[in-house]
Amino acid sequence: MTMQEAADRADVIVAGYAYTVQDGYIEVVDLNDLSKRAVIQNGDVVESLMSDEEDDMVLRYYNRNKEFLE
């Protein structure tokens, strides 16, 4: 997947992170490094290929913008 493809399929992009609603979870992709991904489910990061700091950051961005994902 290219950065453009990830951005196009995203429901919301916040600070370079693409948030895509899937069935029962939110997929997060760092558009600057497509290998960095996370899964948010029930308000928690449940899977991640990001650092702990990035996990905290994408979760904060999610909580501030989740109304746009509903």
Model-derived features with residue positions:
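A short, structured beta-strand/loop element
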Residues: 14-53
